[in-house]
Regions:
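Hydrophobic, aromatic-rich membrane-embedded alpha-helical segments
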Residues: 1-25, 97, 118-128
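Alpha-helical transmembrane segments in eukaryotic/viral proteins
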Residues: 4-7, 22, 57-64, 98-101, ...
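Hydrophobic alpha-helical transmembrane segments of multipass integral membrane proteins
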Residues: 7-10, 14, 42-53, 87-104
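Membrane-cytosol interface at the C-terminal ends of transmembrane alpha helices
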Residues: 14-31, 91-112
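Amphipathic, cytosolic membrane-interfacial segments at TM-TM junctions
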Residues: 25-43
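Membrane-helix interface segments in multi-pass membrane proteins
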Residues: 48-94
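Cytosolic juxtamembrane helix at the C-terminal end of the final transmembrane segment
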Residues: 101-130
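Acidic, Ser/Thr-rich low-complexity segments on the non-lumenal side of membrane proteins
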Residues: 131-135
Length: 135
């Protein structure tokens, strides 16, 4: 189940790790890996949301400035920032896929592998010591 928590986040985003975390709550190993995958998805959604906010802000500012200057042509920010938003999303998703595969393999080997930063947070939430022992 720990492997599934990592691998299913590629297609199931935050839903699959959440379901596994809730169902396998009694297993420290599975809940630790599922919580890490869930925290990664939360971070992923925050980064995507931040990219959308910046893109929307850039488009609005360009439209306001072009309207104020009397220029009625299409705002260039839309055509510049839309591909940037797409590249932002794809690069973050690609990194998430690599992380999911690497840590899914480690979970399959029975390792208590931690995501950078998020692993420590998951350990604190579950009150675990390094290696999975309860505090």
């Amino acid at each position: 189940m720990a492997i599934l928590a990592h691998m299913l986040q590629i297609v199931g985003l935050w839903i699959a790790p959440l379901i596994i975390f809730v169902i396998k709550r009694e297993s420290r190993f599975v809940s630790f890996h599922a919580l890490q995958a869930l925290l990664l998805q939360v971070l992923y959604l925050l980064l995507i949301g931040l990219g959308v906010v910046f893109w929307f802000g850039a488009v609005v500012l360009t439209m306001v400035s072009s309207h104020a200057s009397g220029n009625s042509s299409s705002p260039p920010a839309f055509f510049i920032f839309m591909p940037m938003l797409w590249l932002d999303w794809m690069s973050i998703w690609g990194a998430m896929v690599v992380i999911a595969i690497v840590y899914g393999v480690k979970a399959g080997r029975g390792e208590w592998a931690e995501y950078p930063f998020l692993g420590r947070l998951a350990r604190r939430i579950l009150k675990l010591r390094p290696g999975g022992a309860p505090e």
